[in-house]
Amino acid sequence: MKNFMDKNFLLQTETAQELYHNHAAKMPIIDYHCHLNPQMVADDYRFKSLTEIWLGGDHYKWRAMRSNGVDECFCTGKETSDWEKFEKWAETVPYTFRNPLYHWTHLELKTAFGIDKVLNPKTAREIYDECNEKLSSQEYSARGMMRRYHVETVCTTDDPIDSLEYHIRTRESGFEIKMLPTWRPDKVMAVEVPSDFRTYIEKLSEISEITISDYNDMILALRKRHDYFAEQGCKLSDHGIEEFYAEDYTEGEIKTIFNKIYGGSELTKEEVLKFKSAMLIVLGEMDWEKGWTQQFHYGAIRNNNSRMFKQLGPDTGFDSIGEFATAKAMSKFLDRLNSKGKLTKTILYNLNPCANEVIATMIGNFQDGSIPGKIQFGSGWWFLDQKDGMERQLNALSLLGLLSRFVGMLTDSRSFLSYPRHEYFRRTLCNLLGCDVENGEIPLSEMERVCQMVEDISYFNAKNFFHF
């Protein structure tokens, strides 16, 4: 019987162990998509407690606690203390066997705080106090955490109207780790509620210093902000969409639709789809002009619990996997850009695992030989960011594409304690490849190439792909 989470955790063969310990483990981290708060990095924020850094904003843990019968006040409530919240989390942890939260929890305790104890109600107070004592020191600040995990580059997620002042301040402070912005223009496509859209466009007008009275003005304002993001080092965009949009439209129609929504009138479903379709193309062309990589996270049904959405807002643990027939629209969208010669580097992330093979085959349609892996199948996202989800994504990409050209893992996280997800991914990758070698499916004579492949997927592919 193996010990829990020892040095060979998830590594079932000697070859897997060699690949991980001698190659994957030493690679720096490039976290090219995350949701860290840039101000915390700029301020080198010091966390007040383990609860703040671990439970604050972590909807994964909140979902588990709710499922375990924990009252909402211990998840998101203002009236309960940090210790009370942590105590309820510690009571929940023993019920998370086989959930990735169990592994993440103990991997984070071990790698960040050097704690090998299992978290449960009996150990909760001891672990809480030990972690809080360490968090009070400078080496456990926001920047200290990034250094601890050998992070080289992070890309945050930022709205076109964000000032990026914290990215600038961080860079000018001389901080050795790169923090770059990512262009996330979702709100310019959110035309379902006229008043919300107009409010957003007015903010875009203000920060761009361009008076917006029609569709062309809006595009000019977006281009100005796009240029500004590029000046601040941005190399990626990101789009959170339910599904792909590829309706037929004319520019005249889109101008009319803009006037209608900006004037306060609700759009028909057809008009909404046409506008979203047009914006995806325009934004894709902007990214192509700059040589950026566009990312698409699709397939989530968000804010399912309307009562809790009204109470807590978005991103609080009430989203789930959607079921959308989007392959044709995805193909049509990519083909439109490709036909114009304006399809930039692209990463596709699905939330429904049923689409693994869809994406793994779709990306092969638009590889053009200009660079290795120009169109990428993104790492297992959100609910698929776990051992089984990672393995299924890696296997689909291996069978239908080129795993060796994969740009690898990202945290997609708001937490400074989420970097062990890179370790988890690397261990999973090394275990798959190690088993293949020992099963005679990859020749032992090619071991040097396999070792390089592990280092590439862990670090070098992303470094070269994004030009960091």
UniProtKB/Swiss-Prot annotation:
GO terms for molecular function: glucuronate isomerase activity. Its EC number is 5.3.1.12. This is Uronate isomerase. GO terms for biological process: D-galacturonate catabolic process; D-glucuronate catabolic process. Pfam families: UxaC. Keywords: Isomerase. The keyword ATP-binding does not apply. It comes from Bacteroides fragilis (strain ATCC 25285 / DSM 2151 / CCUG 4856 / JCM 11019 / LMG 10263 / NCTC 9343 / Onslow / VPI 2553 / EN-2). The gene is uxaC. It catalyses: D-glucuronate = D-fructuronate; aldehydo-D-galacturonate = keto-D-tagaturonate.
